[in-house]
A protein has these predicted regions:
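Flavin-dependent oxidoreductase catalytic core characteristic
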Residues: 1-696
Length: 696
């Protein structure tokens, strides 16, 4: 009888031991002291949730949006499937008559950047904000119709955060009214450019503008790089993919070099600055600060994105920790149907300490991101009136918050993965690939350490202005407010006498404000009075930016709850969450609070005690709180974070889909295994089925 090697490996139909995951999660959900759906509506809005359901019903039945094979794909397969998704999305927008919100929801739910991502996220927004009316017709309108596909080429092989150090040049040629793009060195290669490797036929290229012999620094140009006829690179352009990366491998990040490549005058994006045809005379922007508004918007949206990253990671880890049972707690044995069973991992204090503050951080980032968008919109209105008073504080805070919150998210995703134990190491957890793809956030749109310098420069300048009486408290400038309060009493002490005093929002805000102000004051003293160089102060610079932004996160969370239109039960749960976030942050940063003299040793002990109390109070609401994030299983794509709790069944089903399990015998058997197994063996020692006989 011949052997059929094409029979896939299947698990026997058995049930997991112990209480079913579905029942365990149902038990957790029954503990909710608030209305989960109402909290979801408060966070997202009823209309947005309805649109998400509508879009989900469509894409979950679309082959191009199928995630089933995602964890088994090669890089080429991932890129190819990304193309299929992008093409089908364009078709669905027309077929379903989706608006911009619904289109964005479809991309959000698919949760994987694809080849066209940078066309939507960078190319089109730049064309909208930096072009003249003529250029909008020439570039933006066809881009919106996908008649041209673009990317944003700024970073180079030799320079990233130092934009002023970019080497690519764009020299104006008055005789032909053209610009000549050129890459003078190897390090001038544009590098890491998403969508450039194989997709884009146009690029926004940041190049040093040279006209009449003057180098005017980097400016944007809209440059055609590939033929619209056959997609081949144009003469004078060398372009390709940079190769496999730590993550983000569904996107064709690319490189490009220019060899005296001529482009027309209209390629220079001229909304804010102009080069006069024929003479090359340069007109600078009316206000250099105008470009800051776009940066604030991008960074505010990154903070909004952090809440989804934290929400996804904690939803998976908290649900799994409620289902996963390990050991029997002899001091407090868990019973199910009158039988002692193993304890859910989430009942262990250490697991609570690892996960619940991160749940709180997700909510903190929700409120802070929302507030940043509100302030951005307010600032746009004020700038139109010629009032730039809000811009400096908003720009500095958005820079620092981008740095702080994306670092928080990257660390939290990995912490949540580890909190899932051994199964967290499987891609099926939904956390490994997610972590890999999220990591670029800590370096793009400004390296996180370098961004803190922008924040710190503003903080130090503001401190000097407050000291000199040039800045007064304002509703919109919390930096001036806490610095003013600090200078009124630089020897202030924390008033806490019992652990529960730390639950007082005023106590919390005073502590965070004093700590931030103290750090700024000491840094200013070292730079201004002791002659310390900026480079020698970079560690402290990072600390004061971090302290300032932690103050903003805590304050925004607390103030938002004071103004929120929520019922008492929901407000009470969220207040516990806000307090946990604040006190856990204080505990992690204890050295700052102690060094400033604001906290004493006894108070730090009370602080630690109160953190544990808050963990106990938040624990029963853990699963309901992550359910309120309203993240569908399709989005999570996780065996461990399933809403029905059937994690073990999901793990085995995903293992069955592993391509290695599609056959019984591995393809390399004949070449690499059989020669060793058969060497020197005599067949009389083998049974008919190939088992080794026990007889000598």
């Amino acid at each position: 009888m011949s052997f059929d090697n094409n029979i896939p490996t299947k698990f026997p139909k058995l049930e997991p031991r112990g209480p079913a995951g579905e029942l365990l999660l149902a038990s957790e959900r029954a503990k909710a002291s608030f209305d989960v759906k109402e909290l979801s509506k408060f966070m997202y809005g009823e209309q947005w949730l309805a649109k998400m359901d509508k879009v989900l019903n469509v894409i979950s039945n679309e082959p191009a949006f199928d995630k089933t094979g995602r964890y088994y794909e090669s890089r080429q397969e991932r890129v190819a499937n990304g193309f299929k998704k992008d093409k089908r999305l364009i078709e669905l927008v027309k077929e379903q008559n989706w608006d911009e919100t619904e289109t964005n929801i479809a991309t959000f739910l698919y949760d994987q950047s694809t080849p066209f991502s940078l066309h939507y996220n960078m190319f089109i927004p730049t064309l909208r904000s930096q072009t003249t009316d003529e250029q909008k017709k020439l570039f933006l309108e066809p881009a919106l119709k996908h008649q041209i596909i673009g990317c944003y080429a700024q970073t180079e092989l030799g320079h990233g955060s130092n934009v002023q150090g970019l080497e690519t040049t764009a020299t104006y040629i008055p005789e032909t009214n053209e610009f000549e793009l050129h890459s003078p060195t190897l390090t001038a290669s544009k590098w890491w450019i998403g969508g450039l490797g194989k997709v884009a036929n146009h690029a926004i290229v940041m190049a040093r503008l040279i006209t009449n012999g003057k180098d005017l620094g980097p400016h944007p140009f809209c440059v055609q790089i590939r033929s619209l006829k056959d997609h081949r690179p144009l003469e004078g352009v060398t372009v390709g993919d940079i190769g496999p990366k730590f993550g983000f491998n569904s996107v064709d990040n690319g490189f490009i070099m220019f060899d005296h490549y001529r482009i027309p005058h209209v390629a220079f994006l001229a909304k804010y600055s102009q080069v006069k045809p024929g003479t090359g005379e340069y007109s600078k922007p009316p206000n250099a600060k105008l470009s800051y508004g776009t940066m604030v918007y991008v960074r505010a949206n990154i903070v909004m994105g952090v809440r989804y990253a934290l929400a996804k990671a904690t939803t998976i880890a908290v649900r799994y920790s409620a289902v996963r049972q390990q050991f029997v707690d002899s001091a407090n044995p868990k019973k199910w149907d009158n039988k002692v069973v193993e304890t859910p991992v989430l009942d262990y204090t250490m697991q609570q300490y690892r996960l619940l503050p991160t749940v709180a951080a997700a909510y903190a980032c929700f409120f802070t991101g929302t507030e940043m968008i509100r302030l951005y919109n307010l600032n746009q209105v004020e700038m139109q009136k010629g009032n730039f008073g809000l811009l400096a504080d908003l720009h500095a805070s958005s820079s620092g918050l981008k740095s702080l919150t994306t670092t928080m998210a990257a660390e939290a995703i990995e912490d949540c993965r580890r909190a899932c134990g051994g199964h967290g190491y499987s891609l099926f957890s939904g956390l490994g690939q997610f972590y890999q793809d999220y990591l670029p956030n800590v370096t793009w749109e400004g390296d996180n350490y370098i961004l803190t310098q922008q924040t710190a420069r503003y903080l130090l300048k503001t401190y000097r202005n407050v000291v000199a009486g040039k800045a007064v408290p304002s509703e919109y400038n919390q930096t001036v407010n806490y610095l003013t309060q600090y200078l009124q009493n630089t020897k202030a002490k924390c008033p806490v006498t019992v652990p529960t005093d730390f639950n007082n929002p005023e106590v919390i805000l005073a502590a965070f404000g004093f700590r931030a102000a103290y750090g700024i004051a000491k840094a200013a003293e070292q730079i201004d009075n002791q002659g310390r160089s900026w480079n020698s102060m970079l560690v402290e610079i990072n600390r004061i930016s971090r302290a300032h932004c932690q103050f903003l996160l805590v304050r925004t969370f607390i103030i938002a709850l004071q103004n929120a239109n929520l019922d008492k039960a929901t407000t009470a749960v969220l207040r516990n969450l806000a307090t946990l976030f604040a006190l856990h942050t204080m505990e992690k940063e204890l050295s700052d609070f102690l060094l400033s003299g604001y906290l004493n040793g006894d108070q730090t002990s009370m602080l630690k005690e109160q953190v544990i109390v808050l963990l106990e109070q938040v624990r029963p609401q853990a699963v309901p709180l992550v359910d309120a994030f309203a993240l569908p299983d399709y989005y999570l794509h996780s065996a461990l974070g399933r809403s029905d709790g059937n994690v073990y069944k999901a793990m085995t089903e995903m293992a069955e889909r592993e391509p290695l399990n599609h056959t019984q015998v591995v393809s390399s058997y004949e070449e690499c295994i059989k020669p060793f197994v058969h060497a020197g063996q005599t067949t009389d020692r083998w049974n008919e089925d190939g088992t080794l006989s026990a007889k000598l």
